[in-house]
Amino acid sequence: MAGKAGRKQASSNAKIIQGLYKQVSLFLGMAIVRLFISRKVTIGQWIKLVALNVPMFVALYIIVLSGKPKYDGNRVVKQGIDLNDNTNLISYFFDLIYLSLFGNIGIIAFRTFKFWWCLLLCPIYAGYKLYGLKNMFMPGAQQTQADNRSKNANEGQSKSKRQMKRERRGETDSKIKYKYR
């Protein structure tokens, strides 16, 4: 029972990696065939195809290296990191792979490399995430001032909630001071 979760994660990772291999080989193969049957193909277009797919291959290599399970016979030795987890760096590698495949779809359908401009979304998105992370650990001047104001307001508020509620009721119910049963 103890190794059941590890075996489950290992089989899930193996399926994900196998699916990635199928998708990459399908779309890249179709893009290569499309360039082969095109009439006006230059060496520069082949170099572009290779150069623009290098980030995808690096991301795929890192995913396989870190997520591929290792077996010793029928026993799982290492299950790899969880590839279904969206909170780690692996999710960005998946995004990079899918954006590269989108660029290959542009080659397949329209014989253009303009779809590869979508790869600029990766560093922009990473910068956005890093900026949010920076603000979480190193707040700016505006956030520091707002925190100081809220601390001062909390220090000035020395009365408990019950006392404040009594004062409010006292202001509204000034006619009735005692209630008998």
From Swiss-Prot:
All ranges on the Lumenal side of the membrane: 37-45, 111-112
GO cellular component, one term: intracellular membrane-bounded organelle
Protein name: SRP-independent targeting protein 2
Spans within the Cytoplasmic topological domain: 1-15, 67-89, 134-181
Domain of life: Eukaryota
One of the GO biological process terms: protein transport
UniProt entry tagged with the keyword Membrane: yes
Function (record text): Functions in the SND pathway, a SRP (signal recognition particle) and GET (guided entry of tail-anchored proteins) independent pathway for targeting a broad range of substrate proteins to the endoplasmic reticulum. SND functions in parallel to GET in targeting proteins with downstream hydrophobic motifs. Involved in vacuolar processing and morphology.
Primary location recorded for the protein, binned into one broad class: endoplasmic reticulum
Membrane-spanning segments: 16-36, 46-66, 90-110, 113-133
Organism: Saccharomyces cerevisiae (strain ATCC 204508 / S288c)
Keywords: Endoplasmic reticulum, Membrane, Protein transport, Transmembrane, Transmembrane helix, Transport
